[in-house]
């Protein structure tokens, strides 16, 4: 959002000239401005501060184009926008002269022992919605910069919400280097941090580009559950669990569901195995990102499967990142997790989803989960649903689930004979 913040009250006509003359249009000393920025940003709680010019992010644009052409953006239309737009800060603000990149840790600690019957949540989503939290801090920071530097500042402030290659800008600003998992890695903080930006119409002394290397380490590539990391720094979103459970609005491909495991929202595997995170991950000092401020590290699957209305969903998850996939998307995810965990206590809730939920997406994935869990109650519900289901996609899932449940029952019978 483009905004102007005036720390002064509206002046009377007689004082306009005095206040206007007190505010310059230009920063006098870019180096001093950089020092002031560092001081103010760190006081706001940002652990990483960097600056780069507002020119095109050429290298990042080239990589993005190759990724787009390979079809790896999946259904994320916003990532298929023209590279010329995504790689140029001045397309967002014509008067731009500097891009300030800031990093704030969201690392809440290690995942606790698996909650029985729980679906895992990626760490960035344990607390409050970072868009809402960081946006307000950026507003305050811009206003404080204007007051401290004594000049009017035209700025655009955002975090993960505008068409710009934010990680490329942050790398140019010295915040880190690109790891093989495509995450931006800071050698002193790891990769568990949010990136926030201020595009300013003022010249601020820039920082050197971020440097670093993964060396010979390929742990993220070899441990990705779905093999989504196709080459160093290249992630195929069509296979990525984070995409499949968050941005994806359709079904999770049947052939990938078992690889999703117990992840109900996002995935941290490629970050969990990273040596930089094992040694350097910095615990967040922002209380808004703590587990107690939001959904936490696990979702009780049977409870989530019982959410039937958007109003109930919003009441429970409003103000957190978990609203992103919507009610149907989150129940889809929890159904898959229930199936992978063979969660027998979830059978009644899954049967209810299959019989009563208004979303074909939920009914179809609930059917798959029942097929994975098996048992007489699951099989009976699937057979009854096969006679009533009107949606073709859901009916296909039910038929597949019946076959799976039947095979599972045959296996049990053979083992017992």
What are these model-predicted stretches?
Residues 331-343, 363-375, 395-409:
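Structural detector for internal amphipathic alpha-helices that build alpha-solenoid repeat scaffolds
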Residues 16-213, 261:
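Auxiliary alpha/beta "docking" domains used to position bulky ligands
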Residues 293-332, 336:
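Glycine-rich phosphate/pyrophosphate-binding loop
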Residues 195-237:
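Loop-centered beta-sheet repeat module
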